[in-house]
Amino acid sequence: MTFNTETFMLKNQAAIQLYEEVKRQPIFDYHCHLDPKDIFEDRIFDNIVDLWLGGDHYKWRLMRANGISEAEITGPASNLEKFKAFARTLERAYGNPVYHWSAMELKNVFGVNEILTESNAEEIYHRLNHFLKEHKISPRRLIADSKVMFIGTTDYPLDTLKWHKKLAADESFKTVVAPTFRPDEAFIEHRHFVDFITKLGDITQKEITDFSTFIAAMEERIAYFAQNGCRASDISFTEIVFEQTDELELNDLFNKVCEGYIPNQSEISKWQTAVFMELCRLYKKYGFVTQVHFGALRNNHSTIFEKLGADVGVDSLGDQVALTVNMNRLLDSLVKKDSLPKMIWYNLNPAYNIAVANTLANFQANELGVRSYLQFGAGWWFADTKLGMISQMNALAEQGMLANFIGMLTDSRSFLSYQRHDYFRRILCTYLGEWIEEGEVPEDYQALGSMAKDIAYQNAVNYFKN
């Protein structure tokens, strides 16, 4: 069996037949970390390292595991030296998804069919750089070639959305680039919380003195995002908590933190519960899909974090006590307050997949006719792997309705990462194909093919309609 052919990751004849239904589907990439400024300015890339390795902490993490020096990863080494160091790593990375993604990117974007190794790295490096210039490879070119219809970026609540506005006004660019409201700094444990409150007051021209004035100012920013095409919010929590309190304590806590007080864990939980519930109320009011990423234990290597900052490859799976207790109480409280928006829950630790899918199934009732109003999101980050995807789909199929799943997202900072949608589609088709091959579902290719197409694209389109 050869590697990375037309039938790559398609393990049976049923999968091959199903893949014919999805391989030409467009991409609805509802969550990523691309910079809209880069999309608007559309500069032509002139070096493969900037495009392929720059900012990619998946690759950095792998290179560190292979003994590569930091100089050749994020430091002053030349681009050729960094490329060779990555090739030296990649040729030993069997079993890691980066090995598959890289092979797919090289072949499908650049036409490089060879396996990248240390011995051919320099020749391929120069060939790729020539390809970039000859074909004028730019962000918009990569987006168009991948048939990306929608991009959901991740945006600071006080952003002017200048670049989103420019893109929306550019009739030559057909892909919708929508902002996503990401209020990490609104939570008191964030190191920039006090600075955020000051800037929030300045931009909204409101005097923020307590919890209610804080929420009022946040609503003004949510309304601004809604006016500029926003369809979703996002937040990342280390743990899902539920600890209620009254507004008097929240006001006292707000003022103490603004004066330099360091909150304890119970106070952090109370603030997180109160703020998130208020935000959910507003997200429902403005029609935002609410994305919740949870379970990441971040910035664990303090020396690297202090030198390079966040999102550089030193994060881990987290664990927590009473996850389902807290999730159920939180969701039930939102229902009681008529504040439950459409939500996507992304669980990082696969050990909790069945528990999360089972909990979400308790709260699917809605009068809007929305299929799977609460979505169990695709495996993300460390679960963005073959086994991670299968684990997530297994849990969803057994505890909910896989046919309503909104499918894949890149969650990436790279313009080359759209190959992950194809990777997911191939794994999805093998997963469904095994059901057919093993007699677990009828051999109805029309029905299963339609299901695969829905998961690959159409379910997300429908779910994100305002």
Swiss-Prot record:
Pathway: Carbohydrate metabolism; pentose and glucuronate interconversion. Pfam families: UxaC (PF02614). It comes from the Bacteria. Disulfide bonds: none annotated. Its EC number is 5.3.1.12. It is an enzyme of class 5 (isomerase). Keywords: Isomerase. GO terms for molecular function: glucuronate isomerase activity. It catalyses: D-glucuronate = D-fructuronate; aldehydo-D-galacturonate = keto-D-tagaturonate. InterPro entries: Metal_Hydrolase, Uronate_isomerase. GO terms for biological process: D-galacturonate catabolic process; D-glucuronate catabolic process. HAMAP family: UxaC (MF_00675). Belongs to the metallo-dependent hydrolases superfamily. Uronate isomerase family. This is Uronate isomerase. It comes from Streptococcus agalactiae serotype III (strain NEM316). The lineage of its organism: Bacteria, Bacillati, Bacillota, Bacilli, Lactobacillales. The gene is uxaC.
